[in-house]
Amino acid sequence: GQPERAVTTTCAYCGVGCSFKAEVRGDGAATEVVRMVPDRNGDANEGHACVKGRFAYGYATHRDRILKPMIRKTIRDEWREVSWAEAIAYAASELRRVQAKYGRDSIGGITSSRCTNEETFLVQKMVRAAFGNNNVDTCARVCHSPTGYGLSSTFGTSAGTQDFDSVEQADVILVIGANPTDAHPVFASRMKQRLRKGAKLIVIDPRRIDLVRAPHVQATHHLPILPGTNVAMLTALAHVIVTEKLADDAFVRARCDIESFGEWADF
């Protein structure tokens, strides 16, 4: 069918966050997605898309999707369709009841890694403003917490330090324990473009991922380390950099805590 309007949205299949124009028709519960078109002005994808974001949107109108709120007071009860007003009021009253009985910290919120930044922000706002505590988390923390802690300790923020455009200036790309072509396909495409222009790729992974040898690109080096030896491998690299005086001293002085770097180097 022909779309009636386009709605700008963000793909949540992975962390790239590609911008799309969802071309739809109909209104309310009858809204139907006709097609997903990558946004040419999207900062992350610049008009590109992977097969998941472009075509895997059938769940939005799947016949098994629940379109109306339902309530059951015990696990043995049958589900009962209710209005949105009743569902929201019931949820709010139950949350208040639990807090009144077990204390303010008895309730928290956790978001899916499929949520956008804006959706996660709304959840933490609700938990802090309505529940009155800081019991908020996201399942993305399970994989991101080590990098978040390291970035926060080093740079003062747990966010990434580079944008996707920076890969286009990279001369050497080091991929450790990641599989960009499967996990972040649009970014992987930009990386492959740079590799075809002559950048070198080093893959450190027990697996022989697609980037090790793919059509038109292949890794300069593949280190198939044993599972669980990432820290040992990185420590060995750091040891060589320090002992063979390969560190960029000017960069260290400009970007690092000299005293802490000295203690680390001595270690």
Region roles according to the model:
Residues 245-267:
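Internal, active-site/partner-interface "lid" segment
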Residues 1-244, 259:
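N-terminal export/assembly segments and adjacent metallocofactor-ligating motifs
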